[in-house]
């Protein structure tokens, strides 16, 4: 259902609504049968709510990782409850549907060049108040566009204690939006609610780590291939 709803780039399309609702319905069964506790939560941000999945060790005061999905992923994509590398290592994991992703997309919460990190801070605020979380040990993991958003969160919020990302997408977005499959640009323009390509290009030009990377103070691990965008 997640893959089926993905290529429908139309707001309020009945097929997209149906398929996304079936995704959520199926994941309720995942929550029911998971070998550890998972909660679906709503975190307030800017007068709206960001839906997340909170995978918990069942212990108090545990280190916690914020998992940032890639551009075309949702919070249901990862981790796999049958083999959750975070839980197996004693860490909680919170996965969010950030602006433009999953439930946020359905709610028309649009990504801009800088609002994902604002949402990230709201998530950290919420985590810091939970008894299951050691607020001094909140890290970030992300893949592809999630690597960029994750790094921006770490640059924006000093409460992040460590960050590990893969398939890096930190620099100018020329490679992903102009040289890769046209689907990437088509997808992000839909997520952002922008029809004008020039307007979108102007926004995308600000989506780099320039002037932001130097603000990151936490230990950072990046896995990058030679041709990653």
Where are these regions (language model features)?
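Gly/Ala-rich beta-loop-alpha elbow adjacent to hydrolase catalytic centers
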Residues: 142-146, 150
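Hydrolase active-site cap/lid region
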Residues: 152-202, 215-218
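Serine-hydrolase catalytic core
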Residues: 197-229
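N-terminal cap/lid segment of alpha/beta-hydrolase-fold proteins
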Residues: 15-60
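Short beta-strand element of the alpha/beta-hydrolase
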Residues: 61-70
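The serine-hydrolase catalytic nucleophile loop
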Residues: 71-84
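Alpha/beta-hydrolase active-site loop
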Residues: 110-136, 152
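Conserved alpha/beta-hydrolase
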Residues: 86-103
